[in-house]
């Protein structure tokens, strides 16, 4: 049973496809030419119609053209939107993902406004009325001392409720 005693039964296939480049996919009978093109396109073997570079904005379906003034206005609007978003991002105005129950301190935002409102009120009112309003705004020292111990007298349930309400905000 040596290999030289037996005759060869099969033939070898060529290692590469035809020199013309046709493969079995291109010779497949799929019916109409449209179906064949679709099949070849889906298999990645078909050529696309537009092989050249397509220039953006240079298309036959573009029926209207912008005037120079409209183009400048559009560019100015886009630049304005970009500056607004950049300022917002850098200032941290839209802070999200800061954590559960996080809220920015209101005092920081209100303190400049309060100072401005006090100065505007003082310029409008006579000096006699300013001193009276300042006296009314300043509570006596004994009142502040009485208010401080009050939070310690709350029960544990009240503390739990206020703690829970700090995390739950109505929208």
UniProtKB/Swiss-Prot annotation:
InterPro entries per the UniProt record, alphabetical: SMAP, SMAP_dom
Stretches for region Disordered: 1-171
Polar residues: bias regions: 19-29
Disulphide bond pairs: none
Positions of modified residues (Phosphothreonine): 20, 23
Keyword line: Phosphoprotein
Pfam families: SMAP
Compositional bias (Low complexity): 117-128
Residues that bear Phosphoserine: 16
Compositional bias of kind Basic and acidic residues: 46-80, 133-160
PANTHER family hit by this protein: SMALL ACIDIC PROTEIN, SMALL ACIDIC PROTEIN-RELATED
Family label: Belongs to the SMAP family.
Name recorded for this polypeptide: Small acidic protein
